[in-house]
């Protein structure tokens, strides 16, 4: 069941500072080639720099062995719902590393970085087209920053129209935590809207809460349940008629590429996660990029800078009524290059095929697993399926345990306990980049675990058994925080 | 199983009126079980004036945060300092050593609006 | 060799695979799976150019890259928040390993010990660099880290004004303004003099050190000023400077942030970078971002896990310390590898190389007729030169000679240019720059 041989070696228990030996060096620097200059007074200088001392081979081995303790897309099926863990094409990394891309200073004269600006301008256009919006800003460095920008744009829009009382943001109870967190950072009060028994937003509940204080609504489409809102047009309509605006969380765009444009459905502004839908690597928690796409009436408020084509050259400019800068420079260019390359490799038809295969694969998993596991909503899903382990809970095994047992089978677990409104939720998103053989192996593992729950529940509830470390004492980690190496420990 | 000499709120707090009229407040065994292992508790400062049902603090487990509400109007006289280093007392002994807040100048008429032990147990049974 | 027009090497599904799966699901075509989308909006057309083969893609990107050659070749004297510094080969070798590059946020710690232990090392080294007690796993960049630091100070002190020393980077100020505007937090500028008496309700004093112009500020004095006002001291610093300059933590700073890009990260036209964020341990519960902690597993083995997650958005939602989710983990890893490789002696040496070369450059440039150094104080690796002509003209000429000149700051200092010298600039580079400036000054 172990799928990576190196995992039989026990992990190195020492830290870099514990490997450190005085006098070892990891790299040589050239000698000073200018005359030595007078130093500042000693009170301004530091007397001790407590960093480790290691030779280069030690550094390489330490980090290489560390890497071997990870599951990753390159090594394992990684069906994390709403994360879109698809294959990260290597050519994208290659072109992003070209010196002409990787070594440009962000403040270099624009005449000397036209290639970079052209790439950004084209990417803006592609994302505007895909989202059905008028304009795009690439300045935001993650989805959450895209969300914050979006709500700040909505705020600016209402303030300019003399509507400062519009301080309420509506958010479905199934939403990702960044949505209410971003709304709060944007100075809004959050009102939660429940979902109905079909997994759609409760339209009646929505109509009851819209009033003159409404700034807008934040919607994920398809929702975090992997379901397309049947009443999406009416939801947008209700909000618009009440004077509010509709923000789209584009985390689940993998289901909609080339199938529908949020701008056409009635959304006013949205963000896209390049590190999800557009294949840029997750890196263990970033870098990401969360471009913001806006309809014409919101485009002037986009965060800046954006790239404009004045007919002769490409330039960085701030939109006329921009909410401001959200990064010191222009966004995560290295991530933008990868997304651009991905879009160029696929073309429009290729993007459409991504969503077709993503939705097909998820429905295939659902069809094969719905007998052994409870489905929260018995309808076709989109690119992800939410199972509930409530049946297994009655037999004493929880969703968490099933997730941990999957690790023994050589699969990364799906997303657990999200969305919050589903009991013992397991959110599974295969993506389009997995073969049917992999999907079948995963199905087999899930069915095998369902059997184990019935016949040998302990092996599930005490999983994982074959990973480099077993279940961790998270309570101790929170009660006795140990967040860094300390000397003399 | 829930002591008779106390009153209970629907937010799963218990109140014990002490001999000097002050009120001792904590969370119930049901609450600590729902929370899981408590890792941190945030309590109000001494001297804080609270109205009944006002939020007075937070209890955290590894994966959840719960608000604490005062079951009675009153002034915070002292808080259980032992919980700073030993939040697990709330799990181990929620009705005694895991006490959280001692209130002075309480509005004792509000006790009637709270549940008795048997009423609280029925309430729990309904929650299923 | 005709391929199906929709063949993608990134997607395994063949028509036969699709057929089989459709049968298992019980629908006849893939479009049946999109029935929930109202018909009027289905399958819109896209104006994306036709797909490129990998070879064509390489050619296309190489052509775009080639258009940027003047920004990339030749000596660089431009800093102002992004720096051309030495990147050891080890950094990219480790960062390109698929196990680091293509893994997700480590929510399943049993199979993410690589990422988690690397974060713990990152947190350790960030603290050691700035002499601080606690660090998070990194934020987007130096500017947003500073903005989050100011907001954190507001939460800790329950005050709503943020004082900033007027030598703060303009772009950092813009980001701070964006982040504080919607929360009714008011930033206001102070000078070195007016900092002595901060306004009441000031949550923190924000200082960039070395400042935007490259000069050190009087942190001892400014710390006193903050204390007098009951405010926190928030310092935005530079990690290379930390190799030789006394760290902000040693002055009692409450929150210290920095841009991590100089630590082995390519300039990459502005990102991705990583924001370093540290604070005193008493403020731990208000710290934004992810934190990795050390604990044990069920067998008693030491192991690492994301901890104190109740501060974060996925649990606390609208009451979270920040909305941040995806950050810059891989970039943090690169910085960690850089620091492990350079080490105690190496980082100090890099800092000293920068210092001496920058001071050499300053000394020969100020001897050129028409050029002077208008600012007083101690600088690290950046300094302002007042030129006899507009910097825009000077830089245009330098660019033709293949030299990237400093940042034009003539809107702040008449004919001022902000020059940066790092270990990557040779003596020949510096002498050539001086020669060019001399020519331009005639």
What is each PLM-predicted segment?
Chain B
Residues 36-38, 62-65:
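A short beta-loop-beta micro-motif enriched in histidine and acidic residues
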Residues 61, 81:
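Short, conserved catalytic or interaction motifs in soluble domains
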Residues 67-71, 104:
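Histidine- and aromatic-rich ligand-binding microenvironments
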Residues 86:
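Basic, polyanion-binding surface patches
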Residues 21, 62-64, 72:
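Periplasm/extracytoplasmic soluble domains of Gram-negative envelope assemblies
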Residues 1-55, 93-128:
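Acidic, low-complexity mobile loops and tails
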């Amino acid at each position: 069941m172990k799928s990576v041989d190196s995992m039989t070696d026990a992990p190195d228990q020492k830290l870099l500072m514990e490997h450190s030996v005085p006098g070892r060096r990891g790299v040589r620097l050239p000698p000073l080639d200018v005359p030595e200059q007078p130093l500042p007074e000693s009170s301004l200088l530091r007397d001790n720099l407590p960093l480790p001392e290691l030779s280069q081979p030690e550094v390489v081995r330490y980090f290489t062995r560390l890497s071997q303790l990870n599951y990753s897309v390159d090594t394992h099926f990684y069906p994390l719902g709403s994360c879109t863990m698809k294959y990260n094409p290597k050519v994208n990394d290659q072109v992003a590393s070209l010196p002409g891309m990787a070594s440009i200073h962000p403040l270099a004269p624009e005449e000397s970085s036209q290639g970079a600006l052209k790439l950004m301008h084209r990417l803006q256009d592609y994302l505007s087209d895909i989202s059905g919006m008028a304009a795009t800003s690439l300045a935001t460095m993650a989805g959450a920053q895209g969300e914050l920008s979006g709500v700040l744009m909505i705020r600016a829009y209402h303030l300019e129209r003399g509507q400062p009382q519009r301080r309420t943001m509506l958010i479905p109870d199934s939403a990702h935590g960044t949505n209410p967190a971003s709304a709060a950072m944007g100075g809004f009060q959050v009102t939660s809207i429940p979902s109905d028994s079909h997994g759609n937003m409760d339209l009646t509940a929505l109509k009851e809460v819209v009033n003159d204080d409404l700034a807008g609504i934040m919607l994920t489409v398809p929702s975090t349940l992997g379901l397309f809102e049947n009443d999406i047009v009416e939801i947008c309509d209700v909000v618009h008629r009440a004077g509010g605006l509709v923000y789209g969380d584009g985390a689940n765009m993998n289901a909609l590429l080339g199938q529908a444009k949020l701008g056409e459905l009635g959304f006013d502004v949205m963000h896209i996660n390049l590190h999800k839908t557009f294949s840029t690597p997750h890196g263990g928690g970033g870098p990401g990029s969360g471009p913001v796409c806006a309809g014409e009436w919101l485009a002037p408020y986009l965060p800046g800078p954006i790239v404009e084509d004045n007919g002769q050259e490409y330039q960085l400019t701030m939109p006329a009524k921009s909410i401001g800068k959200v990064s010191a420079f222009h966004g995560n260019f290295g991530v933008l290059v990868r997304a651009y390359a991905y879009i160029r490799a696929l073309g429009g038809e290729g993007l459409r095929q991504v969503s077709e295969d993503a939705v097909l694969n998820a429905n295939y998993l659902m069809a094969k697993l719905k007998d052994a596991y409870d489905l929260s909503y018995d309808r076709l899903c989109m690119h992800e399926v939410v199972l509930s382990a409530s049946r297994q809970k009655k037999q004493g095994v929880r969703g968490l345990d099933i997730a941990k047992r999957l690790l023994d089978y050589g699969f990364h677990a799906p997303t657990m306990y999200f969305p919050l409104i589903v009991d013992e939720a397991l959110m599974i998103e295969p993506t389009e980049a997995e073969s049917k053989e992999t999907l079948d192996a995963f199905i087999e593992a899930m069915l095998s675990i369902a059997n184990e729950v019935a016949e040998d529940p302990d092996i599930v509830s005490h999983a994982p058994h074959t990973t480099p470390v077993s279940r961790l004492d998270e309570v101790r980690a929170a009660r006795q925080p140990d967040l860094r190496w300390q000397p003399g420990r | 199983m829930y002591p008779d000499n106390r009153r209970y709120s629907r937010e799963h707090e218990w109140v014990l009126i002490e001999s000097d009229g002050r009120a001792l407040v904590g969370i119930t065994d049901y609450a600590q079980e729902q929370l899981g292992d408590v890792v941190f508790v945030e309590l109000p400062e001494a001297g804080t004036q609270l109205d009944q049902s006002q939020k007075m603090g937070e209890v955290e487990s590894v994966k959840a945060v719960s608000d604490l509400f005062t079951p009675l109007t009153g002034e915070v006289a002292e808080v259980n300092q032992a919980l700073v280093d030993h939040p697990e007392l709330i799990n181990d002994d929620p009705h005694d050593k895991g006490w959280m807040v001692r209130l002075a100048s309480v509005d004792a008429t509000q006790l009637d609006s709270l549940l008795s032990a048997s009423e609280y147990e029925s309430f729990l049974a309904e929650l299923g | 060799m005709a391929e199906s027009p929709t063949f993608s090497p990134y997607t395994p599904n063949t028509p036969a695979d699709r057929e089989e799966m459709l049968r298992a699901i019980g629908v006849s075509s893939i479009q049946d799976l999109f029935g929930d989308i109202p018909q009027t909006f289905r399958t819109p057309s896209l104006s994306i150019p036709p797909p490129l083969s990998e070879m064509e893609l390489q050619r296309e990107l190489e052509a775009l890259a080639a258009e940027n050659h003047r920004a990339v070749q030749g000596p660089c004297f431009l800093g102002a928040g992004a720096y051309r510094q030495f990147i050891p080969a080890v950094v990219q070798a480790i960062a390109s390993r698929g196990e680091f590059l293509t893994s997700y946020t480590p929510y399943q710690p049993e199979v993410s010990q690589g990422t988690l232990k690397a974060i713990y090392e990152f947190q350790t080294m960030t603290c050691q660099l700035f002499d601080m007690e606690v660090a998070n796993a990194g934020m987007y960049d130096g500017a947003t880290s500073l903005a989050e630091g100011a907001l954190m100070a507001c939460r800790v002190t329950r005050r709503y004004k943020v004082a900033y020393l007027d030598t703060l980077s303009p772009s950092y100020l813009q980001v701070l303004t964006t982040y504080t505007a919607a929360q009714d937090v008011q930033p206001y500028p102070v000078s070195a003099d007016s900092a002595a008496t901060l306004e009441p309700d000031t949550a923190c004093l924000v200082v960039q050190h070395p400042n935007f112009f490259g000069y050190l500020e009087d942190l001892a004095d400014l710390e006193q000023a903050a204390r007098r006002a009951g405010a926190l001291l928030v310092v935005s610093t530079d990690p290379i400077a930390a190799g030789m300059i006394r760290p902000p933590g040693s002055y009692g700073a409450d929150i210290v942030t920095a841009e991590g890009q100089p630590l082995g990260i390519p300039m990459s036209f502005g990102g991705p970078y990583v924001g370093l964020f540290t604070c005193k341990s008493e403020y731990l519960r208000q710290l934004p971002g992810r934190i990795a902690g050390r604990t044990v597993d069920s067998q008693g083995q030491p192991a690492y896990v994301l901890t104190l997650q109740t501060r974060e958005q996925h649990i606390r939602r609208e009451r979270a310390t920040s909305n941040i989710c995806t950050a810059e983990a891989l970039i943090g890893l690169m910085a960690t590898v850089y620091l492990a490789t350079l080490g105690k002696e190496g980082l100090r040496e890099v800092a000293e190389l920068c210092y001496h070369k920058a001071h050499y450059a300053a000394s020969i440039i100020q001897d050129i007729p028409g050029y002077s150094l208008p600012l007083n104080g101690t600088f690290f690796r950046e300094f302002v030169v007042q030129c006899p002509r507009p910097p825009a003209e000077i830089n245009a000429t330098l660019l033709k000679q293949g030299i990237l000149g400093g940042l034009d700051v003539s809107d702040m200092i008449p004919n001022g240019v902000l020059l940066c010298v790092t270990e990557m600039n040779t003596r020949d580079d510096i002498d050539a720059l001086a020669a060019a400036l001399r020519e331009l000054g005639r």
